[in-house]
Structures are given as C-alpha cells and as structure tokens.
C-alpha cells in the first residue's frame, strides 16, 4: 500500500470531487436512493416485523463498484415509471468478491450484480440465487495513466520497466483476475519481452480492494499505471488521466451477471428492475456509459 494516501482517504478525496451515492463495500456501506414510500399495510393490527419486511417495496442491491455511476442513472429513470414512484433503492457497492463473501456470511439483499461470472456462480452454488442469472452488460480493459505521466509509460511494454509503480487488486477480485489474464496474453507478444507478465506483476506497489480504488490511486498520481475497465475512465474529470488501449487479441471481455436472491424481500420489484435493465431503455443507458450491450 502506498504510504501517501490510504484507500479510505483516497476514496474520500475522489468522492468530494464527484457527486454519486456509493460507498465502498463494507457491511455498513449502504447508500439509499429514496422516494416517497406509498406502500402501507392493509391490516389494522400490528404485523410481525418479518412479515412487514416481506411485503416491503424497498430494494437492497449488492453491485460491483464499476457499476456505481451507471446504476445511479438507472435508478433515476426506473423510479419514474408507473408503479415505481415510491420505491426506495439501497445500493451496496464494492468488489464482487467482497459482496459474494458478505452474502455467503448471511447478508440479505434482493439483487446481486457481479462484475464476473465466477462470483455469481459461487453465490449460486451456495444456494442463494432464486432462478437463473442473466448477463446484462459487458466491459473491456484499458491501461490508465495519471496526468503528467510521471512513469513515462507510453506503450504496453513500458509497464514491465523496472521501477514502474503499478496498481491492481488481488486476483480474487474480478478486475485483478481480468488484468492478469490480459497480461498473460500480452506476454505472448515478442515486442513486450520475455517474462513480460511476471515483470509487470513484480511492479505492483499496491493491491486495492476494488477497481474504483485502483482508479483513485492512479488519478491522484500515487501510481504510474493500472488496469481498469474502459467505463471507469468516463467518471474521471477530463485531463486527469490518459489511457493506453489493450488490443482485442489481448483484451478480456468482462461479463456482468445479475440475479434475484432468495433473501429478497421485494421480489416483484426486483424482477421489474432486472427487466428494465435488460430492456432497450436500460441497455441504452449502459451503452451511453460505454458498457457493451448484453
């Protein structure tokens, strides 16, 4: 971890520059997007708490941190549709592996949206998914460089130079797994030199909790380069970072599955939201945010 700015401080600094409603995933990192709740019980006698919760029209969604901004836009549109005006949506954003662990340890949610299939499969194997997951979006990888390019990284080969400060995530986090897979493909190109992927990984100075923290590290100039999703760059103010494209032959397509969970307290609203995300309107919002359509 770089000593100049721990992840929590870096995240705070970034959030002070851009308005969005997400917090990095911890058991308490829930942010709510609320309207006027019009739901009421038809009973005149008090109901048990568990039954009231079962009849709730409030949605709790666990979603990959790379979806933060686009899902915020989704909520704004979805909640204006008939039947959704009083819906309250609470989103817990973080690395998909962190969210998967929280769910396996008993956290309750209506929907899980992961940045890779692996985490969703593990949640399904734990018996937590209601029905089948569907792929609703795709993404691709880019190399991100801070303003001023202090490491003088101009080509993919430069990532392997001694002394380059490279930032990533652990391999169990989707972006970390995708980045390592892409580096392995790049290692087959003679132009990148022998042992390319091992040299780049040896340059890692910090393994962050999720992709948004990778972007923060690079944006603040605390790393010379990192690999993130192409969509993450759209959230950074113009001029603060530049990118190096990874060719299709070495890129990795990130697939995002979404599913309703058996712990859902608002399954009908969850189904409506997933239907909206997969609809032409929802897909157009994803495309506008630089995601690839399902």
Which residue ranges define each predicted feature?
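N-terminal secretory signal peptides
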Residues: 1-15, 19-32
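Exported/periplasmic ABC-transporter solute-binding proteins
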Residues: 2, 11, 33-105, 116-117, ...
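Short, structured active-site "lid" loops
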Residues: 108-111
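N-terminal glycine-rich flavin-associated loop
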Residues: 142
